[in-house]
Amino acid sequence: MVRIAVAGAAGRMGRNLVKAAHHNPVAKVAAGSERPESSLVGVDLGELCGEGKFDVVVCDDLAKQIDQFDVIIDFTAPASTLNNLALCQQYGKSIVIGTTGFTEEQREQIDLVAQQVPVVMAPNYSVGVNLVFKLLEKAAKVMGDYCDIEIVEAHHRHKVDAPSGTAIGMGEAIAGAMGNKLSDVAVYAREGITGERTKDEIGFATIRAGDIVGEHTAMFADIGERVEITHKATDRMTFANGAVKAAVWLHEKPAGFYTMTDVLGLNDL
């Protein structure tokens, strides 16, 4: 049984992670945290999520429950995630990271810690999205040299970073398949007189509205035809179940940086 701690357990995603871990037959909800000022610190995690009493309460620092869990699942914010990453480094715990919006320096810090502890990090934990990443690599190799490539993503009004980590992951998959670095070809905003589109650029467009869980489309557009590869999520439990799957897979793995491609065994596709 893999003992799981959920960071940000009282948030929208946190509650789904608690539910997913509770219903996974080889996982156990063993700890959960919230900000110290939260009124939900001390509340039973099961009752918080409508799953009955777990006899595990929300704490304000996972260090206080360090002996209770094996793996942290963290979908919070960069600063909080890095704090939990340091905790894992100190105590030899594993971590599944779903947080997005890291700077390049923060990503380097994660890579460094992954030399000492097992880390799974992915922009999206949906099985479907990770299959899409593979499809995009193949499409880019076939069509990328002569098509205009655009990525459009839509999320709910509360999402604080843009473009989404998944959209960036799509761009990285496409750019990498074409032998490029995304930072060299990405165009994140267009306004005013921009001039004609350049050949190699990958454009991004962002929508924030209502309660959209997550929609992503990559477009390969030529003269006379275009191919669109789309993923639409309708329930956050898709991401939560994938993250718990990753946590179970990661348990007792050696130190290293892993992705959902590793978890799902997609490397040979």
UniProtKB/Swiss-Prot annotation:
Sorted alphabetically, which keywords does the UniProt record give? Amino-acid biosynthesis, Cytoplasm, Diaminopimelate biosynthesis, Lysine biosynthesis, NAD, NADP, Oxidoreductase
Q: Which Pfam families does its entry note?
A: DapB_C, DapB_N
Q: Which PROSITE patterns does this entry report, sorted A to Z?
A: DAPB (PS01298)
Q: Which reaction does it catalyse?
A: (S)-2,3,4,5-tetrahydrodipicolinate + NAD(+) + H2O = (2S,4S)-4-hydroxy-2,3,4,5-tetrahydrodipicolinate + NADH + H(+); (S)-2,3,4,5-tetrahydrodipicolinate + NADP(+) + H2O = (2S,4S)-4-hydroxy-2,3,4,5-tetrahydrodipicolinate + NADPH + H(+)
Entry-linked InterPro entries = DapB_C (IPR022663), DapB_N (IPR000846), DapB_N_CS (IPR022664), DHDPR_bac (IPR023940), NAD(P)-bd_dom_sf (IPR036291)
Subcellular location(s) per record = Cytoplasm
Chain segments annotated as coiled-coil in the UniProt record = none
Q: What does this protein do?
A: Catalyzes the conversion of 4-hydroxy-tetrahydrodipicolinate (HTPA) to tetrahydrodipicolinate.
The family annotation for this protein states: Belongs to the DapB family.
Q: What protein name applies here? A: 4-hydroxy-tetrahydrodipicolinate reductase
Organism of provenance: Vibrio vulnificus (strain CMCP6)
